A protein has these predicted regions:
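N-terminal alpha-helical targeting/anchoring segments
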Residues: 1-5, 28-38
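Short, structured motif recognition centered on aromatic/hydrophobic residues
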Residues: 31-37, 43-50
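Short, surface-exposed beta-strand/loop "edge" segments at domain boundaries and coil↔beta transitions
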Residues: 41-45, 117-120
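Active-site environment of non-heme Fe oxygenases that use a 2-His-1-carboxylate facial triad
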Residues: 62-109, 114-330
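Short, exposed beta-strand/loop patches in secreted or surface proteins that constitute
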Residues: 24-28, 235-236
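Secondary-structure transition/turn motif
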Residues: 36-41, 247-251
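A low-complexity, Ser/Thr/Gly/Pro-enriched, surface-exposed linker/loop concept
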Residues: 1-24, 48-70
Length: 330
């Protein structure tokens, strides 16, 4: 055969295929299509797999489609860590995991309750779902008020809705933030759906949406010895024009040179998005409790934080990132 039996990978290369190869005959054989090629090769293709590959029916193993949400009309997806922490062969764990990952695919976030409150738990949860991805902030980072912060997250000031690290060529895919302590006054959490925001913009201000989807921007992080720069549009679409990814962080974006009209449209679009996301009607606002963990899609859901008083109590979160491959393949 031309396919390795164990790993299902091809054993031939493009150089093994004759130029001008064509299918010369095809016939149904039960639930398969037998195709004969001009070089004498014959292959057996399951009809169900062909129909699925052509997109005529939905892939039963594909994650649920994303659903744009606003707080007033959407559920607030949560799951208990105890329900999903075990092996998939344990009673109830597979079903709870399917529900958890389905909620995450639809809404772009889930709050995981009842996790252990020890340092490093965030990595344990992350490695249960996928694999921790390290960067210049380490494998696991601490979010607390620091005297010399390497990021505004490590201060007590308000943080507006944003996605993390848009300056990376591969922007971190999924973020986990685990609450170890939240005793200070303030410091409430906010989530905003970037899919809902960009869909609203496309409906109401299509020219501004076009500007943010086509004009590339320099995203930059510069700590002297640690510099990262990437150039991308704020809104990234797929080949069919559907939402794929949002890079929105007004602390770190630097527009590239553009003519007056394009630049005006870009700035107007940036302001429109910022205003939409800053509207409490579009924000899911809540307070993380000790043992709560926010699991969110950094390509879609923006997170924010109200200011807090570090003298009024201790506030300490730990965070890390994983990639989409983890939950997508489960």
């Amino acid at each position: 055969g031309q396919i390795e039996a164990t790993n299902r990978q091809r054993l031939f290369t493009p150089l093994d295929v004759e130029p001008g190869l064509v299918a010369v005959d095809a016939e149904l054989d039960g639930d398969a299509l037998i195709v004969a090629f001009s070089d004498g090769h014959r292959c057996r293709l399951p009809v169900a797999a062909l129909i699925q590959r052509l997109g005529w029916v939905a892939d039963p193993e594909a994650p649920p489609a994303p659903i744009a949400w606003e707080p007033g009309a959407a559920p607030f997806p949560t799951v208990s860590w105890t329900a999903i922490a075990g092996g998939l062969n344990e009673p109830g764990v597979a079903e709870a995991t399917v529900d958890f990952l389905g909620d995450f695919a639809r809404h772009g976030f889930v709050i995981i309750r009842d996790t252990p409150t020890t340092e490093g738990t965030v990595a344990e949860v992350a490695n249960h779902i996928g694999y921790v991805a390290g960067n210049n902030f380490g494998w696991v980072f601490d979010v607390r008020n620091e005297p010399k912060p390497t990021d505004l997250a490590y201060t007590a000031i308000e943080l507006k809705p944003h996605t993390d690290q848009p300056y990376r060529k591969v922007q971190p895919g999924l973020q986990l933030l685990h609450c170890l302590a939240n005793e200070a006054e303030g410091g409430d959490s906010v989530l905003v759906d970037g899919l809902a925001a960009t869909e609203a913009m496309r409906r109401e201000q299509p020219d501004l949406h076009e500007a943010l989807a086509t004009i590339e921007v320099d995203f930059r992080y510069d700590m002297g010895t640690d510099v990262a720069i990437d150039r991308r549009p704020v809104v990234q679409l797929d080949s069919a024009g559907r939402f794929r990814q949002l890079r929105f962080n007004t602390k770190l974006d630097f527009p590239v040179p553009a003519d007056g009209a394009d630049l005006d449209a870009w700035y107007a679009g940036r302001r429109w998005l910022a205003a939409w996301m800053d509207d409490p009607a579009h924000q899911a606002a809540f307070r993380l409790g000790r043992g709560d963990l926010m699991f969110m899609d950094n390509h879609r859901v923006l997170h924010a934080r109200t200011a807090f008083d570090p003298t009024s109590g201790h506030r300490h979160l730990q965070g890390c990132y994983i990639e989409h491959d983890g939950p997508d393949t489960r």
